[in-house]
Design a protein with these regions (language model features):
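Generic detector of N-terminal low-structure segments
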Residues: 11-14, 19
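Domain-level signal for soluble alpha/beta catalytic cores
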Residues: 18-227
Length: 227
């Protein structure tokens, strides 16, 4: 598992919508990993749902909210919705696909509640790989796009920008960014580097940077680096 903290450094800055366009021109701090944090606070995970257990079990809702708040108190300027494990495929694996809408919506609601006390905090809508983590998604583009869109539309009302978390190929990134076009929000891309300067797909990060041209792009970060 990748356990590096989410410290943001910007590689590309273009234009920003609905946010201060200079926000990522300096180093910023995002919150840390949520799964391990919730475990340390007493959450008992269900199957492979990991951090999504805190959404499925309403006894853990305050635990999740307090984790968000404590990251803010520790200096986080951006928090990420607890949606890494609420992708449809993970819910299917755990026989709770019928909770897809509820879990993603609840994650957005809990994240947004932090603005009651911290109105200036930014909320990133976390959109994880829609198939396996740390591997390039070789499914059809239409299927990948639908999966990203269906999760994005549920968290869209609660967020300031989208954050694509640990994507593994240029194809996946292109499809993911296309999936959110109708929401007209900026986005940050988090990539997984597996071999030096390469994505798990074998493509170099320089290839990705040369192809990224979108006025809603906030930047690119290395959200996970394999040893």
């Amino acid at each position: 598992n990748c356990k590096i903290p989410y410290i943001v450094f910007t590689i590309i800055i273009i234009n920003i919508f609905f946010m201060d366009k200079n926000f990522f021109k300096i180093t910023r701090v995002l919150d840390g990993g949520m799964g391990q944090e919730l475990l340390s606070r007493g959450m008992k995970p269900k199957g492979t749902l990991w951090s999504a257990t805190a959404l499925l079990n309403d006894n853990y809702h305050n635990l999740l909210l307090n984790a968000h708040l404590d990251y803010i108190k520790a200096g986080a300027e951006v928090i990420v919705t607890n949606t890494f494990a609420t992708r449809r495929i993970r819910l299917i694996e755990n026989k709770v696909e019928d909770k897809f809408e509820y879990l993603n919506t609840k994650a957005g609601e809990i994240a947004k509640k932090t603005k009651d006390d911290y109105p200036n905090i930014l909320i990133a809508g976390g959109l994880p790989p829609q198939n396996s983590t740390y591997k390039a998604d070789d499914r059809s583009e239409d299927i990948i796009k639908d999966d990203f869109y269906n999760q994005a539309k549920l968290i869209n009302p609660y967020i300031d920008f989208f954050y694509f978390d640990v994507l593994s190929s240029i194809k996946e990134i292109n499809v993911a960014t296309q999936s959110i076009e109708e929401f007209n929000k900026p986005y940050l891309i988090g990539v997984h580097i597996s071999e030096g300067t390469e994505l798990p797909s074998g493509e170099k990060i320089s290839e990705l940077l040369n192809k990224l041209k979108n006025k809603k792009l906030l930047g690119v970060i290395l959200s996970c680096v394999s040893p």
